[in-house]
Structure formats: C-alpha cells, structure tokens
Amino acid sequence: MHVGLSVIFQNPGETKPDRDIYAEELVLAKQAEPLGFDSIWSVEHHFTDYTMCPNVFQFLTYMAGCTEKIQLGSMVAVLPWHDPLRVAEQVAMLDVLSNGRTVLGMGRGTGRIEFEGFRVAMPEARGRFAETAEMLLNGLEQGFCEYDGEYVKQPRVDLRPRPYKSFKGRTYAAAISTESAEIMAKMGVGILIVPQKPWPVVQKELTKYRSTFFAATGEQAPAPYCAGWMFIDDSADRAEEMARRYIGAYWDSVIDHYEFNKDHLKNTAGYEFHGEMYDRLNAPGGMQKMTDFYVDLQIWGTPDQVFDKVQTMRENTLADGFMAVCSYGGMPHDEANRNMQQFAKDVMPELKKLTPLEAPLEQTA
C-alpha cells in the first residue's frame, strides 16, 4: 500500500504568526522522505486560517528541491479558480524539476468565500471543472493546450517545458459528477477520497464511477487513494481524547470555512449533498452528532487500532493509498511531530506490506 503524508498549514484562531505555522509544518514535511513516506501532499485553500496554502504547486516545488525520490501530490488543486493554461504550465514545470515525481490531484471547490474571492459563480463550478480538467489533461499528454468550450476558450499554444512523461496512472480527482465522470474516466483519472460521507454512500459512488470507467475505456478503474486525519498513541484512552479534541476542532474549522451552518448550498446547483448538512447540523443535537460522525470516520487509536481503521477504510473503498494528516486543529507542534513519527515507526511498515484488493469489473451501474 502506498502511504503518504499531508501537511495543511492550519492556524485556527491565528494564535501565532502564519510564518511560524509554515516553519513548523515544513519541519514535518522535510521528515517525510527520511521516515519512509512514499509521498508528500498539501491542499489548496485561500483567504482564511482553515488552510493557508494558496499555491500547492509552489509548495511542492519547494519540496522537490528538498527531496530526491518522494512523490509530490496536490490534494487538491481547485481547477475552477484558475486559468487552465497556467495550471498546465505549473504542473509541467514541477514535473520537470522533480524528474517526474508529480501526482496530480484535482477538485472543484466548495468554499463560498473562495469562489467570491476569485469572482467565479459557484453554479458554474461543475462545468468549469470538467472543461478545465479536460484541457489540462489533454495538454499534459499532447504537449500543447487547445480548447473551445462554454467556459474555457484557448487557442493552441505549446507547453514549455514539455511534459516530463504521461500523467496517466498518477492523476486523481476529488469530485466526480455524472457530467464529468466520463471525461475523467477516458483520461484514466483515479479517485481521491477525503472521508466525510457514510461508507455505503461512498461505495455507491465508487460503483457508479467504476461502471463509467469501464464503459468508457474497457479497463478496470485504478484503485482510489484515501486521506485521513490520524492520531496515534500507545494509550487507547489518550488517543481517543486527543482525537476528539483535535479532529473535533478541525471539523469545527470545516464548518466555519465552508459555512455548512448556513443554507446557501441547499440552493446551489452541484452542491446538493453539502446543502443537506445544513439540515443535519440544525436538527436537535445535530452539531454534536455530526462532529462525532466525522471524528469516528477518521484514523485514531493505538498502533493496532490505527492499522485496523486503515484496513476498514481500505475494505470499504478498495483503496491502495493512504495519506495521513498528522497536524491539525491547533495541535501543538511537538505533539504533531510525535504523532507523525510514531505512525511512521509503528504502523506504516505494516501498511506497506498490504497488497492491492481486487475491484469487481463492473460494466453496468
């Protein structure tokens, strides 16, 4: 099993200067390769203390210069906020600088504050994502970009530096809609799962995706990658206490950043699932129930419990990759460092021994 590390640069409540958060998170990131992680990841967000990584490719380029062999992943780059030609150039340049170590993760975004900041209408996100992804992925395969869509208009231009190698087999999408699934499948794009839904819902979505992938390509879809907020300790009681404190605090920051406690997403095309959270959060006891549900989806406990929970995630999704988030929710840096190091020592070697699970070759939904 592929095992990665993700750093997310949170500064909840701005309790310290942002530059200190960067210094601390980079201490973690620079240990990823020596500790044996297969990849290092970060996620694009803007304008709040939720996640302060406005240019994930810039961070990964920095990490390319600090490392020799570890893969460099975006979890994710939010395509509707960008000119797709600039994204293609940044990805191609990162891949050349890193000798082909880039793993491209793409998404469409959910934060209203970010869409408004970039002057993009949220109801257009699904269409913009599909068009941008198609132009981007075709460009990275062909070495030139050209597109004539509803949202993306691009006369033919060459990508220089030319792409290092094909991105097929190392591209993932965190948002697959009915409209974009066929485009993604034809491009050979895998699924990147950030746990937030009940596993039966995730399984249903994956079944639909695998069916679409097979119909479009005649091939079996690649195994997904899963992220997870992780806390490990030799004491099961302490692990649970810290998980509920810090993963719970992270979930609070999710609610604040995405404004799930407001009803705007209920009437925004393409965000119906997210809009349902408003009703669940505002039901009697809803906030605590949602917090407990989210925390219980994540990966925490003793080394054996952490291993078992990754196994459960793997069995529910048939994933062949796990990216651990070890620092979040205001967790002290020393605790985050210990958390990461113990996971790398006590659990990661056993995860790497796991062989891929076989997905059913599904031809119909």
Which residues does each predicted region cover?
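Hydrophobic faces of well-ordered beta-strands that scaffold small-molecule active sites
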Residues: 3-7, 40-42, 72-74, 102-106, ...
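Conserved, mostly hydrophobic/aromatic
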Residues: 36, 44, 63, 94, ...
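Structural motif
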Residues: 35, 97, 187, 316-317
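Short, acidic/polar
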Residues: 19-31, 90, 175-182, 305-312
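N-terminal beta1-alpha1-beta2 module of alpha/beta enzyme domains
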Residues: 1-72, 167-169, 361-365
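An alpha-helical appendage that flanks or caps ligand/catalytic pockets
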Residues: 126-159, 200-319, 352-365
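Active-site mouth loops of central-metabolism enzymes
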Residues: 7-22, 77-84, 165-175, 231, ...
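Internal, glycine-rich beta/alpha segment that forms the wall or movable "lid"
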Residues: 83-190, 199-220, 362
